[in-house]
């Protein structure tokens, strides 16, 4: 399994933009786009839950080369909380209800634009990792918090 790469993020951004999908990069892939020095095996997307957005996402994912089953497409359209896709050119995790984030609209209002990539704010990435409470997420929290503080200080100037 290959690591998440910038080119994959570009392909995702461009395909989802062509189909008008509302989403945010979240998780470690989102942190990496913000400059966090780490690797991950997949792209994590927080997707706005609505039938229209889900249908647009299915079209975009198929355009990217994913071989979706009818059941997977239906899960995406209805906004199943979590959909993991390994049937394409890279691994993709779609999260419609991430732990630690109440509403997509709130995360969207706090988003950070990085070269046209809509990315969850570091505070939201941290909140989600903390709420998930997996060992690997707990282990990364101190580094993510230190990065967030560094990132915030650089933005202030």
Label each PLM-derived region with a short phrase:
Residues 1-157:
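Compositionally biased terminal segments of proteins
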């Amino acid at each position: 399994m290959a690591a998440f790469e910038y080119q994959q993020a570009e392909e995702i951004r461009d395909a989802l933009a062509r189909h008008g999908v509302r989403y945010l990069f979240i998780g470690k892939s989102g942190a990496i786009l913000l400059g966090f020095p780490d690797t991950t095996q997949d792209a994590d997307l927080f997707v706005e839950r609505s039938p229209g957005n889900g249908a647009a996402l299915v079209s975009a994912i198929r355009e990217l080369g994913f071989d979706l089953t009818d059941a997977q497409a239906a899960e995406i359209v209805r906004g199943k909380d979590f959909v993991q896709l390994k049937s394409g050119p890279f691994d993709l995790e779609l999260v419609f209800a991430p732990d630690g984030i109440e509403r997509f609209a709130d995360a969207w209002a706090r988003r950070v634009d990085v070269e046209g990539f809509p990315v969850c704010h570091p505070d939201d990435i941290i909140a989600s990792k903390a709420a998930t409470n997996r060992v690997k997420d707990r282990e990364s929290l101190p580094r993510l918090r230190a990065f967030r503080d560094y990132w915030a200080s650089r933005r202030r100037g």
